[in-house]
Amino acid sequence: MVKAIEFLNKHGFMLRGFLDLPENAEAIVVFLHGFTGNKTEHAGHFRNFSRLLSKNGIASMRMDYHGNGESDGEFYDFRFDWAVEDAYLMLEKAREIKGIKKVYLLGFSLGGAIASIVANDKDVDKLVLWSPAGSMVEHADLFYKNHKHLENGNAYMAGFELSYKFVETIHQYDMFQGVKNFTKEVCICHGEKDLSVDINLSRRYNKEYKNSELHEIPSAGHGYDQVEERDKLYGYSLDFLLR
């Protein structure tokens, strides 16, 4: 059963999304979306994969960060440090669901970087990273530098007002700082033709995690736009979560 859910973060923003809870589900996947993305994600990947999970008896939670999608706030309210807090809150709410015994975390792009930061052996049982943006600090700097600056200090970027606070707060983090905190199983997927996030970042994650597997998907770009690319992405991830 899919139902709309919402909960308040500590900064007063209501986070909104969907909970898909199959009957007798004992495991749940918490999804973390990418930069300028949302709980459905590019090409419907999060929605599609959540439906596939449900058919296999696994629950899922897909939320928008504050300032994104249907959650409270505007994109100019979006801060990296608060997004990290949002992710911790999502994990907390997932653990509170009756009957759930295992919590898995899946992050795409920016969400992959955040997932790698928040995943720890106490709160997460398995970790899935799709094209994790380990270079997000550098990307944020470039986004901010290369777009028109507004009087309030923010930058206007292709329809999105990027807050200087996002850029400031992301510098508080190393995108690889959380690797040491997670020793359980990790599944990483990355397109070989990704022009947005260098595949070498996934190779580094794979090398630094103690219990990791990497699937490099031929011809796939950052969005996994072709059916065969999508099927491999979903297939590798589902097989990993079911075993």
Residue ranges and their predicted role:
Residues 98-109:
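Alpha/beta-hydrolase fold nucleophile elbow
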Residues 1-24:
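N-terminal cap/lid segment of alpha/beta-hydrolase-fold proteins
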Residues 182-183, 188-190, 194:
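Short beta-strand/loop motif that positions the catalytic acidic residue
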Residues 220-234:
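Catalytic histidine-centered segment of alpha/beta-hydrolase-like enzymes
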Residues 68-98:
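Catalytic nucleophile-loop/oxyanion-hole region of alpha/beta-hydrolase
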Residues 121-162:
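Hydrolase active-site cap/lid region
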Residues 195-201, 225:
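Conserved alpha/beta-hydrolase "acid-adjacent" motif
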Residues 23-55, 60-64:
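Short, surface-exposed "cap/lid" segments of acyl-processing enzymes
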